[in-house]
Amino acid sequence: MGKAVKKKYSGASSGGKEVDAEKHLTTVFKFNTDLGQHILKNPLVAQGIVDKAQIKPSDIVLEIGPGTGNLTVRILEQARKVVAVEFDPRMAAELTKRVHGTPVEKKLEILLGDFMKTELPYFDVCISNTPYQISSPLVFKLINQPKPPRVSILMFQREFAMRLLARPGDSLYCRLSANVQMWANVTHIMKVGKNNFRPPPKVESSVVRIEIKNPRPQVDFNEWDGLLRIVFVRKNRTIAAGFKSTTVLEILEKNYKAFLATQSAVPTTSSGDSLINEVKEKIEQVLSETGLAEKRAGKCDQTDFLKLLYGFHQVGIHFA
């Protein structure tokens, strides 16, 4: 993973200058909505987001997509340091101008580059008016940090936020819901209307709090995610139906052979032959023993998926 270009800047400005700053920006360049550039212009909403993070004076805060700095200047007032990851050099330049020469000059560092390709330093808190097209990969990158943040306060498209919060049986419950809720506690903070942004997006937004579970569940992320990818292909089909796909069976057969090799086990057929039938039998065995064959993924909770994963591992079936 490549490192982003580092540029250190610092400083903050008063919220009273925000309107003039935004008007100036519209005459300088056009916001790129394809990059999710919708600047949060409501100072009350911005302050509310920062307050919900409960930043400590000793905290290092990661901000993703700072834009012109309406959140940044407020975070700088409370944190020891802010690391802001910005993709657009124009935005980084505007933020630099805004914070230049202020008392907190040495507290801001800008990393110029793609967040998903950026090697992140240590941070305690994450705050983001998230570019909506990277919402899902952003969440999983935060969850999979070696030392995840204590809390993340993130603005998302309303429907995406509701998927994060959805419970089994809800219409929006999906692989994203089950996956994130395995590793983190998610709560809804506030709704944010489209008119709070410049330019206004086409959809409403919501702010959520994500707190990574500590200690982390003793489950391999890739195994868990691999299982969910199979059962949620069509969440309203039975669990058993998800395992009948030829592609799924071929992947599980390959993984099963790899497992046997690590165990120095001797398969019932020669190594070059197909073990599909053996894998099918093991799948049927696990589904029968767990009693989940006819249940639908959209109705299953975390305990159900853990039963499945444990049962498959017991018979040598792996998903990553």
From Swiss-Prot:
Reactions catalysed according to its record: adenosine(1779)/adenosine(1780) in 18S rRNA + 4 S-adenosyl-L-methionine = N(6)-dimethyladenosine(1779)/N(6)-dimethyladenosine(1780) in 18S rRNA + 4 S-adenosyl-L-homocysteine + 4 H(+)
InterPro entries registered for this protein in UniProt: KsgA/Erm (IPR001737), rRNA_Ade_Mease_Trfase_CS (IPR020596), rRNA_Ade_methylase_Trfase_N (IPR020598), rRNA_adenine_dimethylase (IPR011530), SAM-dependent_MTases_sf (IPR029063)
Gene Ontology MF annotations: 18S rRNA (adenine(1779)-N(6)/adenine(1780)-N(6))-dimethyltransferase activity; RNA binding
GO cellular component annotations of the record: nucleolus
Disulfide cross-links: none
Documented EC number(s): 2.1.1.183
Pfam families the UniProt entry points to: RrnaAD
Gene3D superfamilies hit by this protein: 1.10.8.480, Vaccinia Virus protein VP39
Alphabetized UniProt keyword annotations: Methyltransferase, RNA-binding, rRNA processing, S-adenosyl-L-methionine, Transferase
Positions bound to S-adenosyl-L-methionine: H38, L40, G65, E86, D114, N129
SMART domains: rADc (SM00650)
Role according to the record: Specifically dimethylates two adjacent adenosines in the loop of a conserved hairpin near the 3'-end of 18S rRNA in the 40S particle.
Entry-linked NCBIfam families: ksgA (TIGR00755)
Family: Belongs to the class I-like SAM-binding methyltransferase superfamily. rRNA adenine N(6)-methyltransferase family.
Protein name: Dimethyladenosine transferase
Name of the gene encoding the protein in the UniProt record: DIM1
